[in-house]
Amino acid sequence: MRTTYIAKPGEVERKWYVVDAKDVPMGRLASAVASILRGKNKPTFTPHVDTGDYVIVINAAQVKLTGKKASQKMYYRHSNYPGGLKQRTAGDFLAKEPEKLLETAIKGMLPHNSLGHKQGLKLHVYAGEDHKHAAQNPEVLDITNLI
């Protein structure tokens, strides 16, 4: 009898990838990175097992916002106090916290459950070129052929 392969958590081999976000549209980058974090690029992908790889995103401050998103796209948060609604544009968000902007976009494309949270922990975003994961020997991934 033939059965579908189901990955087991102990059998998963993980790689480390470095992705350069310079001049790449934010949504397309986020979609490709989320797919790698989930493991959908592997033939052993199993929906209920974390089969994804680690991803390091560098140059987050130079990611491209297309159209008028820098001035018109709004991000909201609330302090749970009356009148505590805070809002800012994507351009302000990119100028002040580029790492958090990209993390928000990528994690929004992961499952919203405990498995998605575990997959999100394998994401590391840096505003500049430097990162502290050289010991893992990350492989440079050209994202332009994935988008």
Swiss-Prot record:
GO MF term (any one): structural constituent of ribosome
Pfam families for the chain: Ribosomal_L13 (PF00572)
Protein keywords: Ribonucleoprotein, Ribosomal protein
GO biological process, one term: negative regulation of translation
Coiled-coil segments: none
InterPro entries linked to this entry: Ribosomal_uL13 (IPR005822), Ribosomal_uL13_bac-type (IPR005823), Ribosomal_uL13_CS (IPR023563), Ribosomal_uL13_sf (IPR036899)
GO cellular component, one term: cytosolic large ribosomal subunit
Keyword Ribonucleoprotein in record: yes
Similarity comment text for this entry: Belongs to the universal ribosomal protein uL13 family.
Subunit structure: Part of the 50S ribosomal subunit.
HAMAP family, per the entry: Ribosomal_uL13
Function noted in UniProt: This protein is one of the early assembly proteins of the 50S ribosomal subunit, although it is not seen to bind rRNA by itself. It is important during the early stages of 50S assembly.
Official protein name in the record: Large ribosomal subunit protein uL13
Species the sequence originates in: Limosilactobacillus reuteri (strain DSM 20016) (Lactobacillus reuteri)
